[in-house]
Every structure is written in structure tokens, then in C-alpha cells.
Amino acid sequence: MEAPPTDFFRSLLDRKSFIDILGQGEGKIGGALMPLPDGVWGMPEGMVQNLPGYSGDVQKNREEARALMQKAGYGPDKRLPVTISTRNLAVYRDPAAILIDQFKEIGIDGELETVETAQWVPKLIKKDYKVGLNVLGTAVDDPDVYFYQNYVCNSARNYMGYCDKEFDKMVDQQSMEPDPVKRKKLVWEIDHKLQEDFARPVIYHLRAATCWQPEVKGLTMMTNSQYNGWRFEDVWLDR
């Protein structure tokens, strides 16, 4: 028996349920880059909905996934056992549990393997997993940061080993494009290609918020990053 097709993964996901459960409805469905309107570079809604598995018709998509599984020799009488590996933190375990539950809908019995933090990235680098669920963030919502860091050949964080020389040329091209409108269209094409190539399946983008006491002064929140304002060199307490 040949290995089951990975194409089933495109069709099984109910992405909205991840957002409803994990983010209380606060989140967006998109590609690699931060979706609109929160992000600057996200694909237009029409491009997103045209991606395989993104139509929103979960029932129809899962029927397609079941058909792919049956074609590979799996079904109600022969379910596929799969280990889902993830980091042993709640923000990783919770979506992994939802993924396992959704796997059941198409005849896959998932078993959760939790990995301690010190071993998680080495495990990803070695590709020592069948299905790995990872939570990914980037310092700045910018294509150069995201594409070069995660997807070009030989990138240190290209954990899935995706390598397409034509893709790398497209990334270089958008980086050198001085016209912001033209660059944005190139970025959309690149992101669309990543999702079609199944380079690293994206499930959801959740929103994050920051709270602070009134006596905290001098804190400037970043408009395109969750992480780049935490040096606190200008922050003081008015007490």
C-alpha cells in the first residue's frame, strides 16, 4: 500500500472552528502573511477563497478528502493511524487537539505526541515527525522577513524543506521592486503559490491584545508587530 496522499489535508480543515474555539471568533483565515485588514500584505479575499480547501464549504471539502482517502485504500473499515507532534504548551496542544478531532471526520485516528520545549525545534529541523503542528510568529509583517526566513531554499526555519528555485527568484524580485503597488501584487502571487504548493499548510491567524495599567507611561505599541516594542527603554511608571 502506498502512503496516503497529503492532498486530503487541504480539504479536511474547518478553519473557522479553530478561530471560534481558540480565539473566541477573533482571527482571520489567510495564507502565509497576515490577512487583511490587520496586515498590509495579505491576499485579497477572492484569492484566498480560490485556494484549495478555502471555499468555506466544509462538508463538500471533507467529502473530497474522504474520496482521496478511499482511493489510497483507507475508509471506515481501515482507518489511518497518525501521530501528531507538537510542543508541550497549551497554545500548541489546544489546536492539535482540534486537529485530531477533525481528522476523525475523514477516517484518521490521530494520537497526540507532546514534545518539551528544548526538543521541539531540533525535532522540526530533523523532520522527525509524521504530522507536526507548529505555532509561528514573525518580528515584522513584511514579506522579506517572512519569505526569506521560512520558505526559501536553505533557510534555517524552513522546517518542511520546501525548495523551489523559481519561488526564490520571485521572492528576490518582490524584494527589489520599488513600486509598492507592484510589489504587493508580486507578494500575493508568491503567497498564493505557497498555498497551492502546500509548502506549509496555514490553519488560522489569531489576534492578540496587550493590556497595561494606567501608571505605565512611554509605551508605544507597534502597528505591524507584536514583539518589537518590548525593550522598554522609554517606559516608566508614574507612581
What are these regions (language model features)?
Residues F9, K16, Y92-I108:
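Cysteine-centered nucleophilic/redox motifs
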Residues K130-V135, V202:
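Paired acidic/hydrophobic, glycine-rich loop segments that form the ligand-binding mouth/hinge
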Residues R15, M34, T117, N134-A139:
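Beta->alpha turn/N-cap motifs
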